Design a protein with these regions (language model features):
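A detector for small-residue-rich transmembrane helices and their helix-helix packing motifs
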Residues: 1-234
């Protein structure tokens, strides 16, 4: 497998995140901080996606990006070589697919944080970091392509269909955002996920002439209900 866009993102993000964890000055220069954005430092919308709070935060995001961005070999004679979104984009859009995928990832960093910025633009105590918004965009783009693929949780042998996971993810994230009792930017997860859906739909529709929403619904309509929840290895 050639070095993919996803792998390049993972390598760069991991190197910068690890460097920033031991360097407070570097962390302060890259973190999303609305008052600094107000002073013209718009790069923070993007640079904050290159840093993470700790190894668990970094590991979870990069593993999720790997599984949904690259996926596993499909062994198909026709179709994408791997099941991940980057390769699905190349299947739909041809050689420009990897660049459209990269564009989605970068734009998702911005779009996911816009609501947080508007809400906290004068809040001198607010900071945010991590690639979760962009990773959520990739995950939800993947669910559009394969709504029945089982999504599980670490060490729990239960897998639910992607489209059910998407609904639960949005509902729970919205509930936790309203509670506001943790230090997680659930808003970035929600808007990153919604952007991933919208970007993939419009790109497929207007660049490739492919109605992915009809494709998505057809897969669900033709599915066996037993595919929605599976126990054991997926």
């Amino acid at each position: 497998m050639e070095l993919s866009i996803t792998l390049i993102i993972i390598i760069i993000t991991s190197l910068i995140s690890l460097s920033a964890m031991g360097n407070h000055k570097m962390m302060d220069e890259l973190i999303f901080y609305p008052p600094s954005v107000n002073r013209g430092q718009w790069y923070r919308f993007f640079s904050c996606g290159l840093i993470h709070a700790d190894l668990a935060h970094l590991g979870f995001n990069m593993l999720s990006l790997y599984f949904f961005g690259i996926g596993t070999p499909t062994h198909l004679s026709e179709g994408p070589a791997y099941s991940g979104v980057e390769y699905m984009f190349m299947w739909v859009f041809g050689n420009q697919g990897k660049w459209i995928y990269l564009g989605m990832y970068i734009l998702a960093l911005l779009v996911a944080l816009l609501p947080s910025y508007l809400k906290n633009r004068h809040n001198y105590h607010y900071r945010s970091l991590g690639a979760s918004g962009a990773v959520s965009a990739v995950i939800f783009a993947g669910i559009l392509f394969d709504p029945l693929s089982g999504i599980g949780f670490f060490f729990i042998p239960v897998f639910i269909a992607g489209f059910i996971y998407a609904i639960l993810f949005l509902v729970i994230s919205q509930w936790m955002e309203r509670r506001g009792r943790d230090n997680i930017n659930h808003s970035a997860h929600i808007f990153g996920a919604l952007f991933g859906l919208a970007f993939t739909f419009f790109a497929c529709r207007y660049i490739a002439g492919f109605n992915i929403f009809n494709y998505f619904l057809e897969l669900i309509r033709n599915a066996n209900p037993s595919d929605f929840i599976q126990f054991g290895s997926n």
